[in-house]
Amino acid sequence: MHGLLLAGLLALPMNVLAHPAEQHASNVLSRRGVDIESFRLPLKAKYMDSDAAAQKIQAMSFSKDDDYVSTATKLVKSTFPKSTFRVVDDHYTGTNGIGHVHFKQTAHGLDIDNSDFNVNIDRDGKVFSFGNSFFTGEIPKENPMVKRAFSDPVKALKGAVKALNLPVKSDNAKAKTTAGKESFEFMGTTGALSAPKANLVYLQKEDGTLALTWRVETDVGDNWLLTYVDAHNSETVHNVVDYVASAEFKVFAWGLNDPTEGNPTSIRDPWTDSSPYTWHSDGMTKYPTTRGNNAIAQDNPTGGSTYINNYRPQSPNLIFNYPWSPTATPPSSYKDFSITQLFYTTNRFHDLLYSFGFNEAAGNFQVNNGNKGGRGNDFAIVNAQDGSGTNNANFATPPDGSPGRMRMYNWTTARPNRDGCLEAGIVIHEYAHGLSNRLCGGPANSGCLNALESGGMGEGWGDFYATAIRLKPRDTKDTNYSMGAWAANNPKGIRAYLYSTNLQTNPYMYTSVNSLREVHQIGTVWATMLYDLMWALIEAHGGTYSANPVFRNGVPQDGRHLAMKLVMDGMALQPCNPNFVQARDAILDADRALTNSANKCTIWKAFAKRGLGYGAKYDARNRTGSNRLPPGC
């Protein structure tokens, strides 16, 4: 079925809503006693979006007969008529029809290495948008190639090795000329994975002047560096670029559900092996923004359906560190923080689910599946502060091969208004709709959770994962949790009862579904049962609150992650549009497949507690409950 399921956090219309943080990964150079952060390039870029670009180019003359590279070249010439530059040989037309052309500024025939101009051309051959970091100061009058009063490249290599304490032996280094102006490769070195290289280039400095430098390239494994060594003083290193990018996010860390549970912290390189291209690449293109193989995050204040040209925070050095405070208003004032948080939570959940088996062949959300099965080109499109609604969120799940779409709204239930992106449980709930709809009935069928009861379970799975992920080391089976409490500004949350193992606190039973007519109500019953199941497995296997599960022979070694794994495996086993009884049986079958039914009786006892025991029967109008256990338990 080539359908599309759109699932929301709440029933509409909505009336009055009466682990520890991850450790930072240290940069390898920092461990050598060198702070690479102090050598980062200065940010010089400006960007003119499509609206601004349309106004600027009205006065410019372009020929309809020009190809997109020629059109882009004319724009650069008209913008910087006195500058010299070259076309970089990497232009292409994207799948969205936008042509991308890049230019490098030059001086005296040498590249100004951090002076770039990028032009985007639309399908009609017109300038769509552009950005640049061209040098606008005074170019040195004297051509350095005339007197050649600059240092030897070998001295530059030795200067880089010394300044950065690199594990490269350069005592016997000799420079060999290679193709390109003042380009060299070093022979006689050891310690680098490939022969170091050097190119004579200019560099824009922070003070607005140009420095003549040797760009020394050294690949030492954990760091692949471009070190800009002053061409007149080899003791001076101006800047360093590391190809082995460390991304840093200032966010509410994984396991913190909302701002009441902690403060934003800086987290570096949080991806796992589940994202082999990191979070900022699809294996073909690296993105200095909140875009990658698994997700693309942006704001969407108009609530429109387009997204590719929407606003995203840009960070060439992948440092996404933006301010936020509980009193900040309106939410748009901290949109950079919001988009970053949404991107982080979405990717973190992707990686966790991947470890459980929601991979390429299972129909997960990725652009590049790396020849591992499934259909690619379907990352999750996640919109922060979406203007199409308030006090809710939703996720649209098309079949595998088409992107999922999450829309996160602002909440008007508090003053100042609150941003749903800052409550991880809401993001996780929405993404879980994509999980359950891709697994139930197979990746190509998005119509297998459309019945009332199966749709209810779709809501329940979202609440279950949101709650399981937020557990803390101090929690016990007596700990209760709400859903959506922070966003809704209501400690009881947005569900009829708290998630609790206590039958007085949460009295829902299987037969409670007989009187319920709305998927979120039914979902609360299902999530309540799964909450009991999780705590039963934690009591049987212990609990760990680390960010990532530990597996042995494919089995999570703690009860919390085991519950998440079994519940997910059950989704793929159950029939299209299942009922509670069938979903329970699928979880039992999942345990059989994974552990040879080692947890059979534990699972039965958890479900029997809520009336979904041995002998419970489904009838749309008159479900029969049972607290019994099967023979052998």
Swiss-Prot record:
Keywords: Glycoprotein, Hydrolase, Metal-binding, Metalloprotease, Protease, Secreted, Signal, Virulence, Zinc, Zymogen. Glycans are attached at N410, N480, N622. Its cofactor is Zn(2+). It is an enzyme of class 3 (hydrolase). GO terms for cellular component: extracellular region. Its main location: secreted. The keyword Metal-binding applies. It is found in: Secreted. The keyword Oxidoreductase does not apply. InterPro entries: FTP_domain (IPR011096), Fungal_virulence_M36 (IPR050371), Peptidase_M36 (IPR001842), Peptidase_M4/M1_CTD_sf (IPR027268). It comes from the Eukaryota. Residues 1-18 form the signal peptide. Binds 1 zinc ion per subunit. The active site is at E430. Secreted metalloproteinase probably acting as a virulence factor. GO terms for molecular function: metalloendopeptidase activity; zinc ion binding. Residues 19-246 form a propeptide. This is Extracellular metalloproteinase 3. The lineage of its organism: Eukaryota, Fungi, Dikarya, Ascomycota, Pezizomycotina. Belongs to the peptidase M36 family. Its EC number is 3.4.24.-. Zn(2+) binds at H429, H433. It comes from Trichophyton equinum (Horse ringworm fungus).
